[in-house]
């Protein structure tokens, strides 16, 4: 009797058996995509900022080195 009074019967009546698998897979796909997006954005944002900073510092250092070398050797020295 307690089993019949539960809400499982109502949900089954709302969704037919043929449609249940497709709908469930779709919802699962959406959920997984949302989780993936959240995780990826956090990691990529951090990585992108760090890489950009590193690249900028490296380029600045290299330009300083080239400037010093050009001053020492003359305008013919490059990179």
From Swiss-Prot:
Alphabetized UniProt keyword annotations: Nucleus, Repeat
Superkingdom, taxonomy of origin: Eukaryota
Signal peptide: none
Subcellular location: Nucleus
Protein name: Sperm-specific basic nuclear protein SP4
The keyword Metal-binding is assigned to this record: no
This protein's record includes keyword Repeat: yes
GO cellular component, one term: nucleus
Biased composition (Basic and acidic residues): 61-79
Repeat region (Sequence), residues: 45-52, 53-60
Bias (Basic residues) ranges: 9-60
Region called Disordered, residue ranges: 1-79
UniProt source species: Xenopus laevis
